[in-house]
């Protein structure tokens, strides 16, 4: 593959479900680019906890062989070495962070200050303490390096881009609310179904969700509400609401207090049936009102407040009519006031998340090409 001035060098950090899928999608993108004679991505470094491979002289790595190549060098490539490597790139560079690492997220200013662009689904950078967040944003603004994280909320759904476009076009954001967790979407859609009486116990549905791969290995990591809190923090900050951290506002936890100290997931799941009656009474109260129960995040931009809560919704409400593990986000604005703008779809999964990251990479590449284009 020949490298033109408008190609972009890419370093991939994290090769798990999302990272591995992204490498496959980049390979397909490059094959189409080669056929069409358009710009492609030169993947020049791949790093994970298992191993790494860094290309000599920035030559594109053969993406059909990346697993074999990274197995030659144990452990992750040093972040400082990666900053230095990308800073010396003869072509514009993108760091793609597919991890959930706080350490990598806190290193973003090092990359950005060297004019290394970043595309990532990592929520930690944008929901960390306000000081960490502001340092990242400041580094991007001062260097001009692009920073995109569409997939940090809603996987491949156009949530962040929609919010930014509403703001850029002069709309006034009043409220953002939604069902941000695919796991909790599934649990509540089954436990509190629309149009019929819920019969399954909360504990049984959590167990089924875990068996089907919807939850984290320890379901408490979903039920504590912090994943939703991080996503609401990200959107709140973009909308101009000061949020000190994802733990600085009210977050409803679905973990019964006595089970917070359970030593492992098995002990937690064994004890959860003891609290089914408490959850059932909540559901029965909603059903008497002709409503369903949903777990939602809310950024009340007009009043500068943020929270994560359980809420009851009428059967006709969009939040009451989701399928499976779908996400749904509603934007109430000055323009979209009577009927809020709604984004709905699959908000989890390696394929859609990787596609969201690739979409950001394509946007970065397009902007880099535009800045490199000769003036008329």
UniProtKB/Swiss-Prot annotation:
Residues reported in the UniProt entry to bind L-homoserine: 216, 227
Residues annotated as signal peptide: none
Reaction(s) catalysed by this chain's protein: L-homoserine + NADP(+) = L-aspartate 4-semialdehyde + NADPH + H(+); L-homoserine + NAD(+) = L-aspartate 4-semialdehyde + NADH + H(+)
GO molecular function (one): metal ion binding
Residues the entry annotates as binding Na(+): 150, 153, 155, 157
Binding site for NADPH: 18, 67, 99, 123, 349
Matches recorded under InterPro entries: Asp/hSer_DH_NAD-bd (IPR005106), Bifunc_Aspkin/hSer_DH (IPR011147), HDH_cat (IPR001342), HDH_CS (IPR019811), HDH_short (IPR022697), NAD(P)-bd_dom_sf (IPR036291)
Catalytic EC class: oxidoreductase
A Pfam family annotated for this UniProt entry: Homoserine_dh
Active-site residues from the entry: 231 (proton donor)
Pathway of action: Amino-acid biosynthesis; L-methionine biosynthesis via de novo pathway; L-homoserine from L-aspartate: step 3/3; Amino-acid biosynthesis; L-threonine biosynthesis; L-threonine from L-aspartate: step 3/5
Cofactor, free-text remark: A sodium ion is seen in the structure; a metal ion may subtly affect the relative position of the nucleotide-binding region to influence enzyme activity, and could increase the stability of the enzyme.
Amino-acid positions noted as binding NADP(+) in the UniProt annotation, renumbered to this chain: 17-18, 99, 123, 213, 216, 349
Keyword field: Amino-acid biosynthesis, Metal-binding, Methionine biosynthesis, NAD, NADP, Oxidoreductase, Phosphoprotein, Sodium, Threonine biosynthesis
Enzyme Commission designation: 1.1.1.3
Family from the record: Belongs to the homoserine dehydrogenase family.
Biological role: Catalyzes the conversion of L-aspartate-beta-semialdehyde (L-Asa) to L-homoserine (L-Hse), the third step in the biosynthesis of amino acids that derive from aspartate (the aspartate family of amino acids), including methioinine and threonine, the latter of which is a precursor to isoleucine; production of homoserine leads to a branch-point in the pathway as it can either be O-phosphorylated for processing to threonine, or O-acylated for processing to methionine.
Record protein name field: Homoserine dehydrogenase
Taxonomic source organism: Schizosaccharomyces pombe (strain 972 / ATCC 24843)
Biological classification of the source: Eukaryota, Fungi, Dikarya, Ascomycota, Taphrinomycotina
Gene name of the record: hom6
